[in-house]
């Protein structure tokens, strides 16, 4: 089973990542489907696109956009799957929705580790708009930006 232009993926565990184990107990963090923070972003590739070659292979663990597995309520209050749902817990994913595979950035994505805020008078956990490159890509490496490089970025350009 192959899609022409999309990957087919399935959730690594479940489509929502809202349970944490603390000792021998399980803590449910969220019971609703609305909050994007509790949607799983980890998936396993089941099929690669037939139209082109890619570095991502079947069986690779990928990090994807949070709306792929998301469920939502329509105007009548009926729960619906995302538009990427295919069947039997399988989803279509465009190449741009895959951010990382096997801990390597996909396409031109990079990942930045935030710096902790040491200013005791500020109520922020992390320093705004500054970080250290954790995972880079070929384009950035050609510019001399490698893992460990301290960088700044514009406000509201980051994704958590």
Task: Give the label of every model feature segment.
Residues 1-160:
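Acidic-enriched and Gly/Ser
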